């Protein structure tokens, strides 16, 4: 029986002084804190003797910057996979909530909010799971018998976890267990998913970090 681990790594903190829901918008880089988070995760993986043979990231800048020190630490080339990109969202580029009310309290946006189970304001949860599961399966095959790191985003990672654990895809975003620079590590025996564990190597930097998610 061949054991393989696919680590789903969420990117570090993003420089986002306006508090926008940045989604797939270009140019959203890691903050200084986010860069430190990426370095901590890379050091964590290398120092604990992980057998990482591949590192793959979403095409978005924040994911690429998070993946770079991990790839460097293991001496492997950084690859890109569009299937692990952030979720599409109609509120991209807007302040979703805040002192002024945000996009959710603007009546012009209410027609997009009629179905929280799909959801009606963005990429269907099922579509996100489908593309992520395909990327995970290809990653498992590529790194069979070893470990691979996929750098993605909070919502796609969380939905993948819920699907694997048999949970509903609709959820309260405040209850997502997928913090900045966290690892959701999926374990496989041959092609069978056998469990996961969740770790936060950069937790020491969470105090004062931005709470705004990308989607």
Feature-to-residue mapping (PLM):
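Short, active-site-adjacent cap segments at secondary-structure transitions
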Residues: 15, 62-64, 86-88, 156-158
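Acidic, low-complexity terminal tails and accessory targeting/binding regions
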Residues: 1-4, 76-80, 86-100, 146, ...
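Glycine-rich phosphate-binding loop signature in dinucleotide/nucleotide-binding domains
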Residues: 48-51, 139-146
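Short, well-ordered beta-to-alpha junction loops that form the rim of enzyme active sites
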Residues: 57-60, 83, 151-155
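Generic beta-sheet signal
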Residues: 6, 146-154
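Active-site-proximal alpha-helix that buttresses catalytic centers in soluble enzyme cores
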Residues: 3-4, 9-79
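Active-site catalytic microenvironments for nucleophilic, acid-base chemistry
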Residues: 44, 73, 138, 142, ...
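Short glycine/proline- and acidic residue-enriched helix-loop micro-motifs
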Residues: 106-127
């Amino acid at each position: 029986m061949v054991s393989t681990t696919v680590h789903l790594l969420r990117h570090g903190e993003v420089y986002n002084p306006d508090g926008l829901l940045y989604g797939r918008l270009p140019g959203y880089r890691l903050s200084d804190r986010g860069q430190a988070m990426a370095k901590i995760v890379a050091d964590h993986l290398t120092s604990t003797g992980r057998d990482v043979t591949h590192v793959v990231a979403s095409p978005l800048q924040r994911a690429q910057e998070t993946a770079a020190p991990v790839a460097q630490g293991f001496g492997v080339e950084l690859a890109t996979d569009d299937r692990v990109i952030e979720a599409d969202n109609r509120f991209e580029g807007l302040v979703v909530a805040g002192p002024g009310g945000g996009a959710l309290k603007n009546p012009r946006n209410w027609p997009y909010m009629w179905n929280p189970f799909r959801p009606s304001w963005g990429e269907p949860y099922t579509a996100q799971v489908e593309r992520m599961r395909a990327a995970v399966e290809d990653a498992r095959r590529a790194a069979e018998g070893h470990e691979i790191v996929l750098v993605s985003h909070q919502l796609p990672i969380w939905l993948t976890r819920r699907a694997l654990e048999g949970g509903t895809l609709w959820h309260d975003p405040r209850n997502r267990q997928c913090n900045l620079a966290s690892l959701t590590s999926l374990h496989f025996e041959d092609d069978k998913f056998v469990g996961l564990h969740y770790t936060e190597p950069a937790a020491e930097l969470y105090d004062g970090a931005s709470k705004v998610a990308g989607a």
